[in-house]
Amino acid sequence: MPARLETCISDLDCASSSGSDLSGFLTDEEDCARLQQAASASGPPAPARRGAPNISRASEVPGAQDDEQERRRRRGRTRVRSEALLHSLRRSRRVKANDRERNRMHNLNAALDALRSVLPSFPDDTKLTKIETLRFAYNYIWALAETLRLADQGLPGGGARERLLPPQCVPCLPGPPSPASDAESWGSGAAAASPLSDPSSPAASEDFTYRPGDPVFSFPSLPKDLLHTTPCFIPYH
């Protein structure tokens, strides 16, 4: 027993001496306290620093929403402006198209009036339609061209009429025309060159809209014999 007590006392003495030697070392609690003081002095802790961008992003979210709303407003304004611009463009194009069509019709009517002025005259209360005016002018020009062709060939008017007209029309012809009568010579050439007597003529009988019972159109500026004996003018009687 005394030996054991001596060993315990010696151990305690050694521990006290070693504790006095290790007094310069820090304990765990003191080490943690010093680390906390150093971290607080140097700045916020690492988790706080990591959370800083999240806070800034949260503060930037309202600004981003405002920018998005502003962009949507601008898009809506642009859409409204574009629709108004398209409407104005369509309206201006429609107005221009109407003006072009109106000018075209005015020019067409003026040209037809000029054509009617050079054709054989009609009564004041008679006015041909557009297609009738064109057909009549075509036949009139064709008869004049055939008259000039026969005049160049030197064929006598009566002989040409008898040779070119159908046989059933020959007994209805008047007597031989006078050489000094320009109107009768024109009538003989027109009768010889009638588009109704020539199958190759482009103006066929079915092209005319007149019936045999239609009213007779009078031509004050031309002789009556010429109008009644020229088959190309029969549809207009």
UniProtKB/Swiss-Prot annotation:
Annotated GO CC locations: chromatin; nucleus; perikaryon
A Gene Ontology molecular function term of the record: DNA-binding transcription factor activity, RNA polymerase II-specific
Subcellular location: Nucleus
A single BP term in Gene Ontology: learned vocalization behavior
Biased segments, Low complexity type: 38-53, 180-207
Annotated segments matching region Disordered: 35-83, 175-209
Effect of residue 116 to L: In CCDDRD; uncertain significance
Expression tissues: Expression restricted to the embryonic nervous system.
UniProt keyword annotations, A-Z: Activator, Deafness, Developmental protein, Differentiation, Disease variant, DNA-binding, Intellectual disability, Neurogenesis, Nucleus, Transcription, Transcription regulation
Pfam families with a match to the protein in the record: HLH (PF00010)
Entries under CDD domains matching the protein: bHLH_TS_NGN1_NeuroD3
UniProt function note: Acts as a transcriptional regulator. Involved in the initiation of neuronal differentiation. Activates transcription by binding to the E box (5'-CANNTG-3'). Associates with chromatin to enhancer regulatory elements in genes encoding key transcriptional regulators of neurogenesis.
PANTHER family for this protein: BASIC HELIX-LOOP-HELIX PROTEIN NEUROGENIN-RELATED, NEUROGENIN-1
Disease affiliated with this protein: Cranial dysinnervation disorder, congenital, with absent corneal reflex and developmental delay: An autosomal recessive form of congenital cranial dysinnervation disorder. This term defines a heterogeneous group of neurodevelopmental disorders caused by a primary disturbance of innervation due to deficient, absent, or misguided cranial nerves.
This protein's name: Neurogenin-1
Native source organism of the sequence: Homo sapiens
Gene: NEUROG1
